Amino acid sequence: MDLVRFFIFIIFVIVSIFIILLVLIQDEQGDGIGGVFGGGSSSIFGAKSSSVAVKITGFFIALFFIFVVLLSFLNTRRADDSFLNDIKTENKNSSTFWDDENSESDANINEIKENNLKEK
């Protein structure tokens, strides 16, 4: 599972670099990401078709978010498993403490009861 996590992380880094490069090579005529907030004459749902660079950038942004969710899911599962394993280990070590103590005290109680019955 660690190998899969490593490859997903490498692909995540490559996708991040591609997003940076694609945003840098886009022209500043309102077609890019900055054009959404101050695009001037272009509209969000305009009839003008978006360029290939904008479509590719959108695709890589979608991949970026998919890999973010995958990595967070994989890392969360790993942290939960290791935490639960630590708790199980602690419980195994501590279970003998009260078992031994109770068995000795039970034997002592039985001896006391037998002695009391003999005295009566």
UniProtKB/Swiss-Prot annotation:
Gene Ontology, cellular component aspect: plasma membrane
Membrane topology: Multi-pass membrane protein
Localization, UniProt: Cell membrane
Bridged cysteine pairs (disulfide): none
GO MF term list: protein-transporting ATPase activity
InterPro entries the UniProt entry points to: SecG
Transmembrane segments: 6-26, 54-74
Biological-process GO terms, alphabetical: intracellular protein transmembrane transport; protein secretion; protein transport by the Sec complex
Superkingdom of the source species: Bacteria
Keywords assigned by UniProt, alphabetized: Cell membrane, Membrane, Protein transport, Translocation, Transmembrane, Transmembrane helix, Transport
Family: Belongs to the SecG family.
Function field: Involved in protein export. Participates in an early event of protein translocation.
Stated name of the protein: Probable protein-export membrane protein SecG
Organism: Borreliella burgdorferi (strain ATCC 35210 / DSM 4680 / CIP 102532 / B31)
